[in-house]
Curated annotation (Swiss-Prot):
Lineage: Eukaryota, Metazoa, Ecdysozoa, Arthropoda, Hexapoda
Pfam families, alphabetized: 7tm_1
InterPro entries linked to this entry: GPCR_Rhodpsn (IPR000276), GPCR_Rhodpsn_7TM (IPR017452)
Family per similarity comment: Belongs to the G-protein coupled receptor 1 family.
SUPFAM superfamilies: Family A G protein-coupled receptor-like (SSF81321)
Source organism of the structure: Drosophila melanogaster (Fruit fly)
UniProt-recorded name of the protein: Protein trapped in endoderm-1
């Protein structure tokens, strides 16, 4: 009996030692101050990111002016991706950095990198879609309305989301690498399987190649814009000369003003999209390089990996700020949502000016004239022809 109890005691002691061994092996490679900084940053980004992207989605869906642009569909896709990241990936990330371990089980550990890397691909491919939209608007203006019909936009968005997650099928199925827990960094990521990992290939196909497409496209846009500006200057000089020799230049002046306003609006939208891409690049490039170049030697610079990760998380938070800072239409949409939510009073209805009542009558008469079918037919035909010159 005593011998049996001794054997049982020895068995449980051996089991305890075996259970203690992984704990020693999974000791964090990061300083506690670094993990605390990462956890607090993740919590801050969760709060700002969820609110910011939710308000952005509401603002875009409720703004008829913004919904007129085909670009808006890709911006909505980008916002959904950021919202998914802030509401799913970042809360789990905050907990794992606070606890310095992964405590959510094996299944969720395999899902986590799929959502993380899939979101990165969706964001980048959505930007590619925006870039191609801007390029076609300028380079193939006559075919733009045919290419960006609602059904084609839907197909493009389905393609963006499908490709983003299909790229991850090899590690999901364990064919080329596998999804799992890196115990040294308590991170659920793409691990090597049989000495092979798909990380570098994903970096080239899912990050580097889309970035090159965006850079080349915006370079072509810039060159085209320079040529278009020269055309606009020549056209304006012609309009001025025609106005001096004719008293009937009012219609041309109206169309010139309308097209110039549309061109400036498209310009501002393009600049905003370039800003979003540059910020995304600045935020994500350090993490991508750290994961690819320093993948097996990440104990050398632990703080570098933490800072690179925090910068990558910031990319899902800054887009609403860029929208509000760089585009008036987006600011107006945000104001309306805030007013609807009673954050503050309606700021978009200025007091009538001194000449308001005088101008009101003339505007009503102008409105009656412009509401006639003949005016619309002539205006649409003329403006579509002239605006090709002003599509910048």
């Amino acid at each position: 009996m005593d011998q049996d109890m001794g054997m049982a005691t020895g068995y449980f002691q051996d089991a305890d030692m075996q259970m203690d061994e992984p704990a020693a092996a999974t000791q964090s490679i990061y300083p506690h101050s670094a993990t605390l900084f990462a956890a607090i940053s993740a919590c801050v980004f969760v709060t700002i990111g969820v609110l910011g992207n939710l308000i952005t989605l509401l603002a875009l869906l409720k703004s008829p002016t913004i919904r007129e642009h085909a670009t808006t569909a890709f911006v909505i896709s980008l916002s959904i991706s950021d919202l998914l990241f802030c509401s799913f990936s970042l809360p789990l990330t905050a907990v794992r950095f606070f606890q310095e371990s992964w405590t959510f089980g094996t299944t969720l550990c395999k899902i986590f990198p799929v959502i993380f890397y899939g979101n990165v691909a969706v964001s980048l491919l959505s930007m590619v879609g925006i870039t191609l939209n801007r390029y076609i608007l300028i380079a193939c203006h006559s075919r733009y309305s045919q290419i960006y019909k609602p059904k084609f936009i839907t197909l493009q968005l389905l393609f963006v989301w499908a490709v983003s997650f299909l790229l991850l099928l090899p590690p999901i199925l364990g064919i080329w690498g596998e999804m799992g827990l890196d115990e040294a960094t308590f991170s659920c990521t793409i691990l090597k399987k049989e000495g092979r990992s798909i990380k570098k290939t994903l970096f080239v196909i899912g990050f580097l190649l889309p970035c090159l497409v965006i850079i080349v496209s915006y370079s072509c846009i810039y060159i085209t814009v320079l040529h278009q500006k020269k055309k606009i200057r020549n056209h304006d000089n012609f309009q001025i000369a025609a106005a001096k020799g004719s008293s009937s230049s009012g219609g041309g002046s109206y169309m010139t003003t309308t097209c110039t306003r549309k061109a400036r609006e498209d310009n501002r939208l393009t600049v905003m999209m370039v800003t979003i891409f540059l910020c995304f690049l600045v935020c994500f490039l350090p993490l991508m390089l750290a994961n690819v170049v320093d993948d097996e030697r990440n104990t050398s610079y632990p703080w570098l990996h933490i800072i690179a990760s925090v910068m990558a998380w910031a990319s899902s938070v800054i887009n609403p700020i860029i929208y509000a800072a760089s585009n008036r239409n987006y600011r107006v949409a945000y104001y309306k949502i805030f007013a609807l939510l009673k954050f503050w009073g309606e700021p978009l209805s200025p007091m009538p000016s001194r000449n308001y009542h005088q101008s009101k009558n003339s505007k009503e008469l102008s409105g009656v004239i412009r509401s006639t079918p003949l005016f619309h037919a002539v205006q649409k035909n003329s403006i579509n022809q002239m605006c090709q010159t002003y599509s910048v």
